[in-house]
Amino acid sequence: AKLQEYKEKEESDTETSQLVQKELEQTNMYLGKTDVFGEGITIKLKDFTDEEGNIQSITAEDLLVIVDYLKSAGAEAISINEQRIVNTSEIVYVGNSIVYINQQRILSPYTIKAIGNQTYLESILLGNGGYVDELKKIGFDVDIERSNKISIPKYQKELAHKYIQ
């Protein structure tokens, strides 16, 4: 379909150039190379101290599960504490409430932003017996807000390729 579109636009170098530029902008957006803005949701999570005085921490696994749910609900861009999540992002829990995302130390409270259809994003997390329900039952404070003006920063590192030539 794209090839046919290029051929049809071939008559005008300006139109072809504009089409290629638009494709490049979209590709950079999906790769996380540009700041993005749009409607979506913000999720706030934080560690808590239980009745026995033990700190209960949000783990990397918790964050990964939420990111996976958001992706499955059609999130077009996601960040955690202003760290853009891309296909090469690592979310690693090292203990004592310390999580590394994109090799940056991130501490609780966590703010997860997702751009996409607010209804889908919110409903996948809030469904009866959903992951947010489970976190709340344990005692975690979880807040989800809808917004028409979510901003997610670009991925700050170079996208490195070891094997692609």
Q: Language model features by range: what are they?
A:
Residues 1-45:
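Juxtamembrane "stalk/linker" segments
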Residues 36, 40, 50-164:
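Membrane-proximal structural modules of membrane-associated proteins and complexes
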